[in-house]
Amino acid sequence: MSRRRILILVLVTMLVKTMAGMESKWVETTYEIKKRSGTSEKERESGRLLGVVKRLIVGFRSPFRGRRAISEQT
């Protein structure tokens, strides 16, 4: 892999971890508290990471809200 690809991969990984950390500090609703009572910390962390990755994918697929992605217009 080229240095550029490695750098991009590292930066995206750091962004995902940072966003997951920010998400974990948000106020939890009663539903989330009930849901978390039966799950381990590792499961919660992986769930947060998956949620962040899904949001990033949605953001890359349609970068401008209210407009469809270019691939969907054709």
Swiss-Prot record:
Keyword annotations: Amidation, Antibiotic, Antimicrobial, Cleavage on pair of basic residues, Cytolysis, Fungicide, Membrane, Secreted, Signal, Target cell membrane, Target membrane
Record GO biological process: defense response to bacterium; defense response to fungus; killing of cells of another organism
Entry comment describing in which tissues the protein is expressed: Expressed by the venom gland.
Subcellular location per the Swiss-Prot or TrEMBL entry: Secreted; Target cell membrane
Cellular component annotations (GO), alphabetically ordered: extracellular region; membrane; other organism cell membrane
Signal peptide limits: 1-21
Main location: secreted
Modification Arginine amide occurs at: R65
Propeptide residue interval(s): 22-33, 69-74
Family according to the record: Belongs to the non-disulfide-bridged peptide (NDBP) superfamily. Medium-length antimicrobial peptide (group 3) family.
Its biological purpose: Possesses antimicrobial activity against both Gram-negative and Gram-positive bacteria, as well as against the fungus C.tropicalis. Also possesses a relatively high hemolytic activity. May act by disrupting the integrity of the bacterial cell membrane.
Name used for this protein in its record: Antimicrobial peptide HsAp4
Species of origin: Heterometrus spinifer
